Amino acid sequence: MNDRQELERVKEAVRRIKAETNLETCCSLGLMELDHLKELREAGLDRCHHNLETAASHFEKIVTTHTYEDEVNAVQNAQKAGLDVCVGGIFGMGESFNQRVELAFSIRDLGTQSLPINFLKPIEGTGTGHLETIEYYDALKTIALLRLVLPKIDLFVCGGREEVLTDKQERLFSAGANGILGGNYLTTKGQDPKRDMSMIEDLGLRPPTSWEVNSNS
């Protein structure tokens, strides 16, 4: 996202959020120029989200529009602009478990503050539509792997959790995650946020308040 008009809209949205709430701001904007990221930082942006998608050794089988190095540079540009970063990937795209380990260490080496875990939901007609959905215990092992490699960051489970973990989603927390993304996702629907809150309350957990989030930044 490097269109000037679109950039100005995002900057204005960030300014309003910072002025009217006590929320932290995070944007997911794709491949960005360093100067534009600096403008967003000056507007009040706290964090930039950018996924590596998959391991470097598997990347060319999944992405053809740009390189793995472009993904890494996007994260590093955000850091150069003074932003925290949120870096994750999508699991279940035909990669081996060793390639998940590879991705985990690549994310660790970038120094991310948080990591979103997405599980592929194969969609007919797409390049990965022929793949099988990642198995339940394989998903839990992947969460545990990421927690082992990255013991101190925020690790949250996002797209695909409803399909992969079904009615046992609460186990993602015992596997090592400490958060979830609620609502709908980029191309798929999520479950009712009220159901998420009920699950969290049943586990005796409590989401942090915005004051607690900001005080720990």
Task: Show where each model-derived region lies.
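Short, catalytically relevant binding-site loops at active-site mouths
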Residues: 91-95, 121-124
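Catalytic cores of alpha/beta
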Residues: 32-43, 92-108, 162-175
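Short Asp/Glu-rich motifs
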Residues: 4-6, 36-37, 59-60, 96-99, ...
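Hydrophobic positions in alpha-helices of CheY-like receiver
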Residues: 13-17, 78, 146, 150
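Auxiliary Fe-S-binding modules of radical SAM enzymes
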Residues: 21, 105-217
